[in-house]
Amino acid sequence: MNIILLIIVILILILIFYLTNNILKSKEHMSMKDTRLQKTLEDYGFEIDSEELSIVKKEHGSIIFKKEYPTRFFNNNESHKIAKNKPLSNSIFKKNGIPVPDHVIIDENNKDKFIYEYNIIFPCVLKPVDGMQGKDVNTFIKNKEQFINILNDLLKKYKSVMLENQVYGDNYRIFIFNNQIMDVVKREQPFIIGDGNKSVDQLINEKNNLLTSKKLYPTNNIDWIYIKEQGYSKDKVPEKDKKIFITNTINFHNGANPVRVNIDEIPEINKNMFIKAHKLINLECSGLDYMSDDITIPYDRNNGHIIEINDMVDSFIHVKSDNSSKPNFLFENIAKSFNL
């Protein structure tokens, strides 16, 4: 009996330590992430009260936001759970007429059905149900052998994965705050340029070192199969000025260069669709991942799709857009959105 009580006490102490540690990390995260936002808001007559986790208009004294989850950028717990659950959020979008890729969920219990019976349309996508930052997202899977190998690898890490139809086009991130579009950036697919001397592997390392020196994310998810399909291997030396794409995981955290898009050039039908998706999940702040051949063309004319919605939104991609030529663009728009 005494041993059982001792075990219970130890478990309680571990739980207390875990909760305390996470609270401290949340406050630290709030402090680090919102430094630039706080400075910009102060320029517009606002201040962030880090104790109350609110944004206050100084001359009015009005609390604009007061949320419990600072690391989720003003979003409540229920909305956070829906956004994190990619199958659920995409199902909500589909029911409400928002274009998303078709998907099914695969786990250890039903994987044989999808391997041996299901009619998979290639190329396809396999990714974690609740992944972030493009981690373990596998796009342009071209055949059954690739599919089986990738599926088995993913199911060693995750309880379930999503199988999606492959969507084509350029990759965009739409930052929405206060039910308004604050900024839009296009992620450029990572590539290398041959110089006639260095191998593919050397060129990739050189580019990653350059990205790291600029405090940007390197391309860690290298797709060697994709590179081989372009006629190259690790040790092969590309011709001078030859452009070789090195990954199909087009994500800022995987070395994709962000380029700002003029919001005024995006048609109203697209902007309304983005905001509708944001509101359906009841979010205050979100990052929509959208794919189309051209975001300035109405989505119903060029098969544009929302890939997913994120509620833990990284502002760094917006700061670094266009080689950091307008690092405060996003935060100035956020400040201007408070019409008091």
Where on the chain are the PLM-derived regions?
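ATP-binding N-terminal substructure of ATP-dependent carboxylate-amine bond-forming enzymes
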Residues: 2-84, 88-91
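Residues at alpha-helix termini
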Residues: 39-43, 94-95, 229, 276, ...
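General beta-strand structural signal in soluble alpha/beta enzymes
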Residues: 48-51, 126, 162-163, 288
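Residue-level "edge-of-site" marker
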Residues: 53-54, 106-107, 290-291
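A short beta-strand motif that forms the metal-chelation/ATP-contact edge
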Residues: 57, 61-66, 173-177, 181-183, ...
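Active-site nucleotide/adenylate-binding loops and adjacent lid/helix of ATP-dependent enzymes
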Residues: 62-220, 267-272
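A long amphipathic alpha-helix within ATP-dependent nucleotide-binding catalytic cores
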Residues: 205-296
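C-terminal active-site "lid" helix and adjoining low-complexity regulatory extension at the edge
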Residues: 258-265, 279-285, 292-340
